[in-house]
Structures are given as C-alpha cells and as structure tokens.
Amino acid sequence: MFIKQVIIEGFKSYKEQVATEEFSNKVNCVVGANGSGKSNFFHAIRFVLSDIYQNLRSEDRHALLHEGAGHQVVSAFVEIVFDNSDNRFPVDKEEIRLRRTVGLKKDDYFLDGKHITKGEVMNLLESAGFSRANPYYVVQQGKIASLTLMKDIERLDLLKEIGGTRVYEERRRESLRIMQETGNKRKQIIEVVHYLDERLRELDEEKEELRKYQQLDKQRKSLEYTIYDKELHDAREKLEQVEVARTKASEESTKMYDRVEKAQDDSKSLDESLKELTKELQTLYKEKETVEAQQTKALKKKTKLELDVKDFQDRITGNIQSKNDALEQLNTVEREMQDSLRELEAIKPLYESQVDKENQTSKRINELEKTLSILYQKQGRATQFSNKAARDKWLRKEIEDLKRVLDSNTVQEQKLQDEILRLNTDLTERDEHIKKHEVEIGELESRISKSHELFNTKKRERDEEQRKRKEKWGEESQLSSEIDKLKTELERAKKNLDHATPGDVRRGLNSIRRICADYRINGVFGPLVELVDCDEKFFTAVEVTAGNSLFNVVVENDDISTKIIRHLNSLKGGRVTFLPLNRIKAPRVNYPKDSDAIPLLKKLKFDSKFEPALGQVFGRTVVCRDLNVATRVAKNDDLDCITMEGDQVSRKGGMTGGFYDHRRSKLRFMNIIMQNTKSINEKEKELEDVRRQLQVIDQQITQLVTEQQRLEADWTLCKLQVEQLKQEIANANKQKHAIHKAIEYKEKLLGDIRTRIDQVRSSMSMKEAEMGTELVDHLTPEEREQLSKLNPEIKDLKEKKFAYQADRIERETRKAELEANIATNLKRRITELQATIASIDDDSLPSSAGTKEQELDDAKLSVNEAAKELKSVCDSIDEKTKQIKKIKDEKAKLKTLEDDCKGTLQDLDKKLEELFSLRNTLLAKQDEYTKKIRGLGPLSSDAFDTYKRKNIKELQKMLHRCSEQLQQFSHVNKKALDQYVNFTEQREELQNRQAELDAGDEKIKELITVLDQRKDESIERTFKGVAHHFRDVFSELVQDGYGNLIIMKKKDLDNDDEDDDDDDGGREAVTEGRVEKYIGVKVKVSFTGQGETQLMKQLSGGQKTVVALALIFAIQRCDPAPFYLFDEIDAALDPQYRTAVGNLIRRLADDYGTQFITTTFRPELVRVADKIYGVFHKNRVSIVNVISKDQALDFIEKDQSHDT
C-alpha cells in the first residue's frame, strides 16, 4: 500500500484545486523555496491522517482555510488516493480515496464519497498498520532536533510508548485506585462492626424488661383488637343499612333521571318537530304568498281577458251591423250603377249616332266648302296666275305639301293604332294580373285560417305542458326539502358519531379515507360499525361488547394494512386497528342450548365474507336474559355474557355494568347515517329524474312557443301579403280605368286623323284633276250652277250641324256625367263596400275572439286552481298552526314534568349526598379500625376470643388499666429484640463483605505484579529490538562507526561513576508508589570505530542528528509503516551523512517496497528519488508540479548559492 495521489483545495496556501501526479511507490522528493508551501503540503497529508489537527476549534478551522486576494474561501478539503492492491485496508478495492473537508462550522471525513466518522478513520488506519503508539512514520521539522535533546528518562518514555506499556500503566493505576477504594471501605466496615458489637452488648441487657413489656403489650393488643373488631362490625352493619338506603334512593333517582331524560328527549324531539313544523309553516306562508300572487295574477289576467272578449264581441257585433249596412248600401249603389249603365247604354248609341251625324255633316260641309273654295279658286286662277304653267307649278307645289301632310298624318295614324293595340294588351295583362292576385289572396286566406287553427292547438299543448311543469316544480321543491332535511339529520348523526369516537381513531379513519383515495388502494371494506346491523334492542349489547373494536377496519389482506399503516405513520394520522381477512380466523365455540342465552353473532346482519372478523369480536359473547343467567353461563360454558342493558360478565369472573347513555349509541348514529345516505341517494335520483323531465318539458314548451311565434309570424306575413295583393288589384283597376280613358282618347284622335287624311286626299285629287286643264277666267255653266247651289246647301248643312252638335253636346254631357259617376263614384263605392264586406268576412276577429275565449276559460281554470291551492295551503297552515300549538302545549307539560322530576331529583341528590357522606364516614371508620387492626400486627391465636364476650365499656376499662401498667415500662426500648436481631445480621453481612474485600485486594495485588512484570518484559523486548536496529542503522550511516543503546537500571545508577556529572541520569523513576526497574536509556556511539564511545552531549550538532536519525530508522524497523513522510530530515547533516541517509532510504525502498515522501534543500536525497515534485508560490498561492532531477538540482544549487 502507498499514497498514489494527493488532491488539495482551499487548504492554507493552496487556493485552487491542486492534484499531484501519481507518486512513485518508492522514493519521492519535494523541493521548493522557503515559504513556497512544502510544509503546508506535508501538513495537508497529516491533516487527513489525523496525527495532528484532531480536535479543531472554530478559530483553528478558520486558520486552515486559505486567506488571500479575491473571494474568501469558506471550505477546504484534502483527499489522499491510496493504492490498496495489497489489501492492507480491509476494503475490497484496489484504490481508496480518503477525504477530509473542513469549513467554518464543519469537519467531515469521506471514504470513496461516503461520509464516515473520525473513529472509523482511526480504526481504518490502524487496520492498515498505522500505530498510534509509534507516530514516527511522519517526521516533521523539529522532530530530529527534539530527539537530539532528549534526556535518558525521555528516551525510556519513548521506548515505553513504542512498546505499548502505557496500557499496562493505565491498568496498574486503575488497579491501585480500586485498592485504595477497597481500603477505605474496609476501614468503614471495621468501624461499623465495632459499633454494632457495642450496641449488641447494650441490647442484651434490655431484653428482660422487654419480655415483661411484651406480655402487657400482648394483653393491650388483644383488648384493642376486640374493641376495634366490635367497632368495625358495628360500622359494617350501619354501612350495609346505608348501602340499602342509598341503593333504594339511587334506583328512585335513576327512575327520576330516566323520566327527566325521557322528558328531555321528548322535548328535544318536540323541538325538532317544532323546528320542522315552523320551517314548513314558513314555507307554507311563502307558498301562500306565491299562490296569492298567482291568484292575483290569474284574476288580473281573467279580468283583462273578459274585457278583451267583450271588446271582440262588441267589435264582431259592430262588424255584422257594418256588413249589413254595407250590403244594403252596396245593393243601392249597384242598383244605381245598373240604372246608370242602362241609361249610359241607351245614351251611347244616340250619342254615337249624333256624333256620326255631326261628323258626316261636318265632312259634307268640308267637302262642299272645299268644292266651293276650288270653284272660287278656279274662278280666280286667271287673275292669280298668268298662264297655265304657273298654275300647274303652284298646284304641284300644293300637291307636294298636301302629300307631306298626308304622310305625316299616315304616320300619326299608324302610331295611334299601335298605341291603342298596346293599351289593349296592357288592359288584358291587368285583367290576368287581377285574376292571379285574387287566386293568391284565396290561398293566403286559407293559409291564415289553418295557421290560426294550428296556433290554437299549439297554445293548448303549451298550456298543458306548463301545467305539467308546474306540477314537476312542486315535486322538485318537495324532494329538495326532503333531501335538505335528510342531510341535516345525516350531518347531525355524523357529528354525534365523531364525538362518540376516540380522537386518534377518528383521525385514523379520516386519514384512511384520504390515503385510499390518494394512493388508489383497494381492498379496504371499512370499520365494523359500517359493516354490521342488528335490531335496535341489541344496540347496547353490541356496543358494550365491541367497545372501540367497532372502529376496527376490515381489509382484504395484511399487505394492504401494512401499506396503510406506513402512510399513517408518515402522515401522523392517528391510530387504527386492522382486521386482515386472510389472517384472522373466527373461534370455534360451543354455545349453550339455552333459550335465555343466545349467541350475539346470530343477532347480527352482515355479509358472509366478514364472518371471521365479526366472529373474532363477537364470537365468544352470548346475550343473556339477566345477570343471574349471565353469571351461570359464564361460569359453566366459559363464555363472555352480556344483558340487553349492557351489563357484562366475563368468562374470567369479572363483572362490568352500570348506566349506559342510549342517546350516544354509535350503532343508532350509524343506522341513521346509512338509512339517510340511502334515502338521500334515492331522493337525489328521483330529483335528477324530475329535473330531467323538467328539462324535457322546458324544451317542449320552448319548441311550442317557437312554433307559435313562427305561426304568428306566418299569418302576419300572409295578412301583409293579402293587403299588398288587394292594393295591387286596386292599383290595377285604376290602371284599367286610365287605360280605357287613354284608348277612347286615342280612338278619337285616330278618327280625327283619318278625317284629315280623307280631306287631304280629296284636296290632292282635286288639285291633281285641275292640273293640265286650261286656264280660264270664268266658270262653266254647270260650275256656276253648282256654285249657286253650294252656298245654300252649306248654310243648310251648317244649321243641321249646329242642331246635331247641340244634341250631341247634351247627350255627351249626360254621358260624361254618367261615366264620371260610374267611374269615380259608383265603382269606387262598390269597390269600397265590397272591400269592407270582404274585410268583415275575412276578419280574424272571430278566430281571435275564440282564442281569447279559450284563454279566458284557461284563466278561469287557473283562478279556480289557485283558489283551490290557496285553500289547501291555508288548510295546511291551519293544520300546522294547530300542530305547533299542540307541540307547545306538550312541551309545557313536559317542562312541568321535568321541573317536578328535577325537584324530586334535587331532594334525592341531597338525600344521596347525606347518605354518601354517612357512607364515607362509616367507610373511613371501617378503614380506620381495619388499619388499627392491621397496625396491631400479628396476634396470638387466643387474642381473638379471650375478650369476645365482654362489652366495649368493660374492654375500655381493662385497656385503661393495661395502659397504666405499660407506662411503667415507658423507658423500655421496644425495638430492642428487633434491633438485636437486625444488628446481628448486619454484623455478619459486614464481616462477609470484609472477607470479600480482602480477597479482592489480594487479587488486585497479584494483577499489579503481573502488570509490572509484563511491562518490564515489553520494555526489554522493545529495547532489544530498537537497540539491535540502532546498531545496524548506525553502522550503515557511519562507516567504521558503531553505536549502542544502554538501558539504565536502579542499581546501575548507584555504581555508574562515568555518569556522575550527567544531569539526566540521577533521577529515580517512581510510578504509583513503585520504584521503577528502569530509569533511562543512554546512547553511546563512536564515529571513528576507535577509542572510547561518546555520550550524546559530547557530540557535535551534525553527529547528534545522525544519532537521532539512526534512532528514528531503528524505531521504524521495529514497527514498519506502509510509507514514511520526512520533512527536511537532512537539514543539519554533514554532506557524507546526507549521502548515507539517501542511500539508506533508497535501499529500504528497493528491498522492502516502502514508499518515502521527503522534502529537502540538499541534493543527496534528490539524487536517490524516483519522482521529484516542485512547490511554487505566486500571489500567496501554492502549486505542485512534477519536475526533472536536473531542474531540482539546479534549483537547490541556486538556492544554496543565494543563501551563501
């Protein structure tokens, strides 16, 4: 084993982490300038090996931390890596890392990263060969110097330390201490024995007086016993009488208490009922307010609907009257229309005839006037034109103008014909449009009627659904009220059960529920109280039998219970007892065949899989009719028995009983919890079903209302469309009338155009006929005759035309009046009256009135229902009020009964207190006389009956006389005999103890002798080994020299003349009163091999250092270590000895495989080193690097020249 590597961080001058290269397993040398950190490097290794820096205080730890520039180092560590290939450390690893970390508040060791204690480190190092008795595997600066200055006695102490004689000395000192304590005890024992002997002589003289005293004392005790016994018997008789009276009063008090308790329970029950009734009454009052509000609302709605229906009826009656009036007016207007049409039809032909006559006359007049004009023009052509050609030219021009006029009139004629044709087409289209709209109106009116019918149907369905919803609301309210009531009772029962459950058990059960939920643990069935049920009359028996076992939790197997217990412990969540079904077995019990004793287990209801758990708790218990039966069964059948009242008789003989408060029954609370939980679940399911039905009804109502709104919107739209279509028909009729007017006007214009065309054509034909004729200045006879006839004829025609015109205007005026009356009055009035009649016929008033009447019927039904409901609520209020009054009366009676019972109870309590006080007095008296009898001590057999027949007064007189006689012996030591016996026993015991101490003293003396012998043997053995190795090592270090170690004895001191002046040889060693055999170790050496040997004080400094080194190497050879640390051991050596030391180290490393780590300022150790490390220092921070041998020698040479 050897040190493989050293890692330092934050330790003294080593700030940053420094990890050395692996050390050689032979010779390693460390060089560096003074103050560079070589010694700190050695201190770091010793810091881990714990030979220094063992018990560090805070300031010591702070001194080990690096102090320099930059941030402060708060912790440091040194880690040594050991090569353990030879397994010197008892660890199955080839490499071991031992680290020591130090901080301001810590000092820890780590082995391969795991924390270990300081003691474990020391044991580990000792197991590897590091002896606490031999610390010379580390030689620090100054150790050599101290060895050179050692006195002979100090060298002897060194040998003792190396040889381990300290153990012998410690054991010897402990033995001497024990001997001293034993001597002290022996002295004390001798003094006590001497005192006891004197007291025994005195007590022997007092025994005779004591005998006489004892005879009188025997008589006194006998008298006192008889008096005490009689008094005790009297007290017991009185106590029995008091107990009988107290039992009777207690029974009566119990009855009164039961009556008070029953009255209180009944009162509480009445309070609960009163509370519920008050709550129900408040609910009824609220319901009454709601129903009254509904009734008021229904009455308002009914009144409004009645007014609406009356309004509709009035409007319908008015519409019927209006329709009749309109029909009458329509008939009148239609008759007038027919008359006007007939008159118009009669006038039209006459008018047209007159117009035709007028037109024909006008046409004839125009023709004649034209002829007359032509004749006049022809007659004046000769004067107008100079020749025929000019005339023809003019005629041609006239003909062309007429032709243009003709063309223009022809175009106008064609245009008028086209317009008339278009107007006729428009008229036909308007007729078709009107027919189409009338068909659409019929369809829309049919659709409106169907929508009204469907709307009324949907309304009835909606009203029915609303009625159903109202019923469901009532059910929902009722269920919610019942659930709230059940939950209140459930919470009360849970709270009462919690109060009846021990606190740690309650917390445990709550913790189990959370643990099972959080960690998803299955197989937990719950406490027994939740798994068992029975008839209510067995509740007391079951609870008293089980006790807190009712809260034992049944689980499927013990793995589950183990897991839960682990969680309970970690959470500190209370305590619970588990019953794993895979572990428990129900006991096999033979029950008695007795009708008065029934197995309790048979009266329980539970799941068969829980039978082992319940059998373990209740299997050995039977329910008995009374305590007599229970006592008999428990004794004969070895079973636990219990009565229905909860009185127990154990099979082991014990009896337990008394009052049991049934109001705190755990099973009753659990029964309420289970039943209410079941009822709540059922009610909540019903409530959920009702709410689901309400949701469906709400959806249906919403759907029906939506459908009603759609139908209402549809018929409203249809009405708007009908009105629009009727308006379009009216507009079309107006347009038809306008078109008729336009056609008449266009036809008249067309007739005028055609007349003008004929006139133009006639004029053109006349002018064309005149062309080419001769130009004459006079007319022909025929023309003159014609001219003479034309004027009269024209005049006559004009007169006729005037007559025709006058007649035509008259007829035209009448015709216009008729047409205007028909068009603007009669037709409009007919249309209006028809529209009025149609609106009355098509009016939705009857339908709306029917709807309103239906709504009125519904409103009347709602009013009746509200009245019935209000009456029902009022009846319920009256009933609840009567019940409340009845409960209050019952409460008053119960209060009176309770007060009477409490008064009786107070009297009984007072009587019981008096009896109890008397009982305590008698008990105290009984205890007093019992204690007095016991205080008399053991009595002779005749003492019980000697004075039995005497009365108390005689006994007291006799006792008085006996007491007077005893006063004569008042000076007698009453404990003389006891003291004599006691002192005799104490003397024998002390004498035995003295003998034991004497024997122990001899054994301790033998042990001290053995220890002294073994100590001397150890010193001699160690000295021989060290002396032998010293001679060898000295001869190796000093050529031709020799040296010896001489151990000095007491006899040598007296005969040694050579050392008379030696200051270290004249002290006599004394250890704990014993003169030591050895008093010192001398060193005698010769460096030349010739002449006499020299003592240490006769040597030079270098020679002393050689001797000290030889002694160190000798000690090391006696107790070899795996490696050695030398810190500048060659500092004071002469060069030839430094070479010898280096060669010795080299030889030890090669021959024995020992590792050396040395520091030096000299070249000799560097030359023999296998690996050399340089320590450098910069900015108060040290680092360690491997350097070559030449670099090390150069550094040493420069350092020595610098020192020079």
Swiss-Prot record:
A Gene Ontology cellular-component term: nucleus
Gene Ontology process terms (BP): cell division; chromosome segregation; DNA repair; meiotic cell cycle; sister chromatid cohesion
Binding residue positions for ATP: 32-39
Disruption phenotype: Altered chromosome dynamics and cell division during seed development, leading to aberrant mitoses and giant polyploid nuclei in endosperm as well as arrested embryos with a few small cells.
UniProt domain SMC hinge: residue ranges: 522-633
Keyword match Secreted: no
Location within or outside the cell: Nucleus; Cytoplasm; Nucleus matrix; Chromosome
Motif (Nuclear localization signal 4): 799-806
Motif position, Nuclear localization signal 1: 171-178
UniProt PTM: Acetylation at Lys-105 and Lys-106 is important for genome stability and S phase sister chromatid cohesion.
An example Gene Ontology molecular-function term: chromatin binding
Domain of life: Eukaryota
Residue ranges of the motif Nuclear localization signal 3: 650-657
Function recorded in the entry: Central component of cohesin, a complex required for chromosome cohesion during the cell cycle. The cohesin complex may form a large proteinaceous ring within which sister chromatids can be trapped. At anaphase, the complex is cleaved and dissociates from chromatin, allowing sister chromatids to segregate. Cohesion is coupled to DNA replication and is involved in DNA repair. The cohesin complex also plays an important role in spindle pole assembly during mitosis and in chromosomes movement. Essential protein plant viability. Required for chromosome segregation (e.g.
Comment text on domains: The flexible SMC hinge domain, which separates the large intramolecular coiled coil regions, allows the heterotypic interaction with the corresponding domain of SMC1A or SMC1B, forming a V-shaped heterodimer. The two heads of the heterodimer are then connected by different ends of the cleavable RAD21 protein, forming a ring structure.
Name of the protein described by the UniProt record: Structural maintenance of chromosomes protein 3
